Amino acid sequence: MASNMDREMILADFQACTGIENIDEAITLLEQNNWDLVAAINGVIPQENGILQSDFGGETMPGPTFDPASPPAPAPAPSSSAFRPVMPSRQIVERQPRMLDFRVEYRDRNVDVVLEDSCTVGEIKQILENELQIPVPKMLLKGWKTGDVEDSTVLKSLHLPKNNSLYVLTPDLPPPSSSSHAGALQESLNQNFMLIITHREVQREYNLNFSGSSTVQEVKRNVYDLTSIPVRHQLWEGWPASATDDSMCLAESGLSYPCHRLTVGRRTSPVQTREQSEEQSTVVHMVSDSDGDDFEDASEFGVVDGEVFGMASSTMRKSPMMPENAENEGDALLQFTAEFSSRYGDCHPVFFIGSLEAAFQEAFYVKARDRKLLAIYLHHDESVLTNVFCSQMLCAESIVSYLSQNFITWAWDLTKDANRARFLTMCNRHFGSVIAQTIRTQKTDQFPLFLIIMGKRSSNEVLNVIQGNTTVDELMMRLMAAMEIFSAQQQEDIKDEDEREARENVKREQDEAYRLSLEADRAKREAHEREMAEQFRLEQIRKEQEEEREAIRLSLEQALPPEPEEENAEPVSKLRIRTPSGEFLERRFLASNKLQIVFDFVASKGFPWDEFKLLSTFPRRDVTQLDPNKSLLEVNLFPQETLFLLAKE
């Protein structure tokens, strides 16, 4: 299998020989032939033109080598290439199945899968199902350069390179804990990531600190400042598969914490790679006339002479620790950290990347248990003590460890007058004019300085100003002495904070109990008011019904015909009616009166006939069921009768 450099050269020669300008199509044809250039050309060029044999194969025929004593070989025709026809009797080697390597990332796991390109996407998912214990229907396999693909898609049809990075999403499966995930993400946003970035061309490492809220794009822009490689020409290795978007925060990109290694280089064109290979080779290759045009267009790939020579010269001179008049303090500290690492090695304090105000927030404006001291390192390149202080004291493992555990370390370079004036302004604003004057009057040979700051309720107190003419033991003793003062103050702050939280908890509990009591009283009062309103409504309905019944009773009573005398010329019927209470109602009616008059009489006494019924004994019958328009004589209620009133069911 050809190396990456050989593949670039094979790709360029294949396009030159076949005239195929589409790079994707050319790569596909080469991969189908396992990057066998001769086999790929034979598959495109008709067989009558002869079978080609390449100098890349293991069975190459001896070609002319460069010999200073020998006369130069005649130049070939413009259409000639680095290949020469041989007899058709060359036996083509049987093509081996092409294997594809996949690295699949799922949460905190990486699974390596190796399959033939004749397999399908679904077979990858089946392997992942056994490894990750995730059902295939619940699994989304992402990271394909062509977009989403079906499970039945054959890998060969995707024209994939040999090494591929994919990742698995499971939107239908609940995460381990959404709240814990959100908490972990918030914690990652507040963390600082150390990126160890290797510049491939110059074999130089940069140690850069970034906050979790920084984006991938910001990292690439900062690397451009250090390496002079524009972002569009940067070729990266080491980013996690999930870091697919330059706008993604580092906390979400899947970087290893606290350190992550990356490699960056300059993206080169296939033509440049081939020309470099030809310069190193002792075999004379005949190239086509079009290569000259390709060389003239090499600037399209970002190769500028000034950049190349500037890169070489930058490694020879000493770069400043911090740019002058930097607009952003975070960017200035990124360069400071990178330059500090390049001068004194990777073992150094973790410098906080951000403004001085942000360092205050990180150190002081948190819970009392989480507070730390703030150490401000003031650098000066022109001091004779700087190199010794940085290399032997500040980078000592004991000092680095102690600072990392107990301090937030912030740095600034006072070499340039503009940066010095800027820091004195910050110092005057945050620490007062006394400290600013102390730093202003320091001589160059007294630098570097190490300021130990402790946050208090109303102001920030400078506990100690350590000059560069010290030793590791003395520096450690002064750091520990500052830590003792801070620890005593921290314990008081923790006690005050706990007492304040206890008081606030009691107050919250009392407020909650009072609120619940008010709600209970209000609910009780509202229930009583509803009950009284309901009783009033029912009483009103009852009164209205009684008034209505009384009005009906009076109207019926007034409408009754007068009671006839016992001695009357017309026949008289005497009725005796027993009420449910046992009382008797007696009245005389004319035998010719209708039965309705009897009903009206009973209703006028408070027994409406729609609620009560009249029963006779012999024969037993319900009189209210009879025709009310018939006379008493017709219904046999003559000359006298006893009736009973019963309430209807």
From Swiss-Prot:
* PROSITE patterns named in the record: UBX (PS50033)
Q: Which SMART domains match?
A: UAS (SM00594), UBX (SM00166)
- Looking at the Swiss-Prot or TrEMBL record, what is one Pfam family this protein matches? FAF1
What are the protein's UniProt keywords?
A: Apoptosis, Nucleus, Phosphoprotein
- Residues modified as Phosphothreonine are T579
The segment annotated Disordered runs over 55-84
Task: List modified residues, type Phosphoserine.
Answer: S319, S581
Domain UBX stretches: 568-645
Identify the GO cellular component terms for this protein: cytoplasm; cytosol; endoplasmic reticulum; nuclear envelope; nucleus; ooplasm; perinuclear region of cytoplasm; VCP-NPL4-UFD1 AAA ATPase complex
Kindly give the InterPro entries that the UniProt entry links to this protein: FAF1-like_UBX, FAF1_2-like_UAS, FAF1_UBA, Thioredoxin-like_sf, UAS, Ubiquitin-like_domsf, UBX_dom, UBX_domain-protein
Q: Localized where?
A: Nucleus
Q: Which GO terms describe its biological process?
A: apoptotic process; ERAD pathway; Fas signaling pathway; negative regulation of canonical NF-kappaB signal transduction; positive regulation of DNA replication; positive regulation of extrinsic apoptotic signaling pathway via death domain receptors; positive regulation of protein catabolic process; positive regulation of protein-containing complex assembly
Residue ranges constituting the UBA domain according to the UniProt record = 1-57
Q: Name one GO molecular function term.
A: protein kinase binding
Tissue specificity note:
Central nervous system.
Q: How does it assemble?
A: Interacts with CDT1 and ATPase VCP/p97. Interacts (via UBA domain) with FAS (via death domain). Interacts (via UBA domain) with NLRP12 (via DAPIN/PYRIN domain).
Role summary: Ubiquitin-binding protein. Required for the progression of DNA replication forks by targeting DNA replication licensing factor CDT1 for degradation. Potentiates but cannot initiate FAS-induced apoptosis.
User: By what name is this protein known?
Assistant: FAS-associated factor 1
